[in-house]
């Protein structure tokens, strides 16, 4: 988060109208996890709620929602070059993010279906939704004569490993923040139809309900997980080499026990909330600001609304949430945005690599300091915070 926002194009050539996603520090990430631990999860503590959510997934409320209509005909040609570029960049990032979710959920459903069929079915339904979203976004890109090469992404994207617990935190927040982002844009454009630059936004109201249901699933899954893993793993990976021994299962059990201590849960909750909020804020105010302006939105007001709402929603599952109402909270995020502009200017200068690195160092340290101060802000206890949001 404290690094600069430097964009570098993939070296793969553009062929047949397809383009690979551009990489930035704040680009959507592709994830993998411990499939053995996932398949051994005991859902019995909250199985009834998970089964109810799975039944909702089976109904597939949006089966017939993502059908294009005549409003798309010629819509791309109506955009001026600057707005066109901003919107295509939005489509690319959104499509990559949805496709990332599809790959993770699809692989999970495939790998755990024999031992954990309920969990596997839920992930399969969510993979269906994410694939539908990614395809719909990619179809909109084709209106501009472009298309993301999703096959190339699958084969060449770097995958970040997260243990299951971290996957739960990260994907829960990703889905819930996606809900608030989409519904905020939809409501704004319903009130300001002249700012609706493309018919894609007409689909956001129902679309965001998919995100909301996915978030509810991870909420229920986390409630099922306080010390409920039947068996973890007899394997351990050191330096890329996997070792197997029954004793390693006890090591993983001890690590899992530590991760489930109340203080640990509070620390991780604060970490993931801050990581997600700071990343979004830095991206939207740093490199996406003009896109939101094209929709008639103030990026700062929009992000603060989304962060506040996501923080409130997270109090239903996390033991603590961030004090986003502290007067220093957004001030420090704004400082990070300013620092990232400085880092970007240095990166784009004509100086040599060593000189650039030395000039960037104080700004990196400043970003790290701002993030540390934000993390150390006294959090809000969810049990005290919840009544005001329900």
UniProtKB/Swiss-Prot annotation:
**Gene Ontology molecular function, alphabetical:** iron ion binding; magnesium-protoporphyrin IX monomethyl ester (oxidative) cyclase activity
List the catalytic activities from the record: Mg-protoporphyrin IX 13-monomethyl ester + 3 NADPH + 3 O2 + 2 H(+) = 3,8-divinyl protochlorophyllide a + 3 NADP(+) + 5 H2O
Key word Iron-sulfur present in the record?
A: no
Q: Name one GO biological process term.
A: light-independent chlorophyll biosynthetic process
Annotated membrane-spanning segments are none
The family assignment reads:
Belongs to the AcsF family.
Record's function text: Catalyzes the formation of the isocyclic ring in chlorophyll biosynthesis. Mediates the cyclase reaction, which results in the formation of divinylprotochlorophyllide (Pchlide) characteristic of all chlorophylls from magnesium-protoporphyrin IX 13-monomethyl ester (MgPMME).
Q: What is this protein called?
A: Magnesium-protoporphyrin IX monomethyl ester [oxidative] cyclase
Species in which this protein is naturally found = Prochlorococcus marinus (strain MIT 9312)
Q: Which gene encodes it?
A: acsF
């Amino acid at each position: 988060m404290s690094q600069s926002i430097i964009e570098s194009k993939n070296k793969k050539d553009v062929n047949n109208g397809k383009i690979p996603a551009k990489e930035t520090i704040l680009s959507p990430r592709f994830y993998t996890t411990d499939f053995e631990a996932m398949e051994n999860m005991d859902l019995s503590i909250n199985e009834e709620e998970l089964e109810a959510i799975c039944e909702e997934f089976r109904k597939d409320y949006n089966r017939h929602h993502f059908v294009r209509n005549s409003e798309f005909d010629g819509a791309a040609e109506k955009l001026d070059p600057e707005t066109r570029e901003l919107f295509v960049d939005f489509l690319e990032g959104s499509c990559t993010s949805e496709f990332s979710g599809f790959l993770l959920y699809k692989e999970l459903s495939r790998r755990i279906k024999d031992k954990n069929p309920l969990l596997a079915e839920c992930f399969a339904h969510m993979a269906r939704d994410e694939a539908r979203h990614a395809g719909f976004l990619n179809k909109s890109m084709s209106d501009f004569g472009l298309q993301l090469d999703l096959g190339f992404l699958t084969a060449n994207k770097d995958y970040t490993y997260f243990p299951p617990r971290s996957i739960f935190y990260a994907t829960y927040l990703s889905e819930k923040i996606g809900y608030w982002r989409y519904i905020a844009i939809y409501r704004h454009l319903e009130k300001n139809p002249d700012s609706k630059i493309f018919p894609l936004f007409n689909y956001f109201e129902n679309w965001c309900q998919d995100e909301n249901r996915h978030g509810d699933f991870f909420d229920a899954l986390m409630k099922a997980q306080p010390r409920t893993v039947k068996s973890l793993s007899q394997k351990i990976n050191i330096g890329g080499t996997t070792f197997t021994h029954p004793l390693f299962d006890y090591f993983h059990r001890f690590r899992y026990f530590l991760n489930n201590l109340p203080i640990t849960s509070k620390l991780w909750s604060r970490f993931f909330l801050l990581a997600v909020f700071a990343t979004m804020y830095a991206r939207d105010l740093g490199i996406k600001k003009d896109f939101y302006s094209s929709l008639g939105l103030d990026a700062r007001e929009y992000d603060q609304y989304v962060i506040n709402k996501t923080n409130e929603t997270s109090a239903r599952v996390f033991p603590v949430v961030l004090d986003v109402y502290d007067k220093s909270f957004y001030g420090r995020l704004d400082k990070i945005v300013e620092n990232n502009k400085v880092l970007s200017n240095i990166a784009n200068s004509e100086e040599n690599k060593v000189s650039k690195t030395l000039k960037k160092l104080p700004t990196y340290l400043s970003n790290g300091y701002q993030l540390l101060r934000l993390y150390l802000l006294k959090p809000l206890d969810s049990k005290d915070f919840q009544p005001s949001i329900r």
